[in-house]
């Protein structure tokens, strides 16, 4: 069980620390800081919605629904008899990522994103597109946790 809490705490601390660095050193609407060629950059953005900037309407609906989902996830893990390390790490990643983005939403009404993997940028069907959204550490933790959960579902949930 300690692994679950440790993983969630590590994600929260790393997420909030890197977002603070982005707020301090990257400016909104300015040039990206190129790290590797033109495909890995740091680009400051603020997201008031969920993944890919999708909106659920009122910010309060997003905060309440996220809180309920995270509370259910927390209770599920705490009361589960499953102590598989992969299970605990996976759910720790998801919980930590959800709390990390939740902190931003509660404090400022938006989530800071800054990691920009630009796989493709150009015209697609007559419109200018950047194929991959800008994201943050919390988003990465949630995505990795969800992917591992899907791939290893049978390993985590077989008796």
Curated annotation (Swiss-Prot):
This is Lipoprotein signal peptidase. The keyword Transferase does not apply. It catalyses: Release of signal peptides from bacterial membrane prolipoproteins. Hydrolyzes -Xaa-Yaa-Zaa-|-(S,diacylglyceryl)Cys-, in which Xaa is hydrophobic (preferably Leu), and Yaa (Ala or Ser) and Zaa (Gly or Ala) have small, neutral side chains. It is an enzyme of class 3 (hydrolase). Disulfide bonds: none annotated. It is found in: Cell inner membrane. Pathway: Protein modification; lipoprotein biosynthesis (signal peptide cleavage). One of its GO terms (biological process) is proteolysis. One of its GO terms (molecular function) is aspartic-type endopeptidase activity.
């Amino acid at each position: 069980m300690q692994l679950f809490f440790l993983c969630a705490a590590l994600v929260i601390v790393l997420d909030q620390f890197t977002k603070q660095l982005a707020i301090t050193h990257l400016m909104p609407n300015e040039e990206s800081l190129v790290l590797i060629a033109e495909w890995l950059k740091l680009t400051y953005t603020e997201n008031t919605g969920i993944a890919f900037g999708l909106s659920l309407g009122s910010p309060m609906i997003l905060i309440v629904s996220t809180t309920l989902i995270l509370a259910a996830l927390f209770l599920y893990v705490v009361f589960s008899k499953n102590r598989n390390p992969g299970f605990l790490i996976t759910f720790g990643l998801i919980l930590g990522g959800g709390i990390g983005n939740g902190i931003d939403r509660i404090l400022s009404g938006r989530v800071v994103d800054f990691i920009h993997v630009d796989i493709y940028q150009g015209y697609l069907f007559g419109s200018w597109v950047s194929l991959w959204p800008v994201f943050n550490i919390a988003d990465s933790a949630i995505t990795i946790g969800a992917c591992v959960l899907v791939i290893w579902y049978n390993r985590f949930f077989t008796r």
